[in-house]
Amino acid sequence: MSNISLESENEAVKRALESSYCPEPIREARQKQDEILCERLRQGPYKIADIGCGNGYHAVLFAPHCLLYHGFEISPEMAEDAHALWKKERIDNAQIFICDAAEAVVEEEFYDLVFCLYFTPGNIRDKSDDLSLYNDAYLDRNPRFIQTISRFYRALKIGGSAFFTMYKNVPETEAAQVDFYVHTGQRVVTPLGSRFVATAEGFWSARWTQDSIASNLGACGIGAEDIAFHDLNDIAWLVEVEKHSH
């Protein structure tokens, strides 16, 4: 179990999201992610689920193509920010559920699209202060990730798609992560070369290989033939999953 409070981790995430500082590779990947999705959503409107929706920005970005938007967010403070943003932008088809997405109650085959963006897939894990828990075997078959994504994969309609923004496990990614977290007032506690970066404030962010992605998604019932990797840049993929059957 973790002694770091959920509030501490939420505050670290909020600080990173609101920071004016962002390393160029991360900024570039986020921008390319949004460009690709805006283009893909032109055929809407769609019913969208967004795992770890943060400040609700995507409900605004995708509003022209959105029939309804359900954001799932564990931080009440981030949810408040989302409500404020939606009020300001006059978004009336969005709803936020304050919960752990792994425990969310969602209707089967309801959504056209499921999102888990801005590297949120790499934040999903069993919380522990013992960093040795997160060994290669754990990262290749992360139980909490599998529980969360399986739940939302069941909520995806046949013919629907899920999109995940994921860090590549390369040194350039690790350098960008460390740079970002240090510049947002956090203290990195993992040695260089780990497959994840953790901070004393409770933030945790994993990097992925195509094999580790296929292994984790395979445990969710998703075949390798249904997974596509879209390069965002040298440090990130937008991973697309198409649901062809139950």
Map each language-model feature to its residues.
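Class I SAM-dependent methyltransferase "Motif I" SAM/SAH-binding loop
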Residues: 52-54
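Class I SAM-dependent methyltransferase SAM/SAH-binding core
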Residues: 57, 62-103
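A short acidic, Gly/Pro-enriched loop at the edge of an enzyme's catalytic core
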Residues: 106-114
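A short glycine-rich, Lys/Arg-flanked "PGG" loop and its adjoining helix->strand segment in the class I
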Residues: 133-158
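SAM-dependent methyltransferase
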Residues: 159-218, 224-226
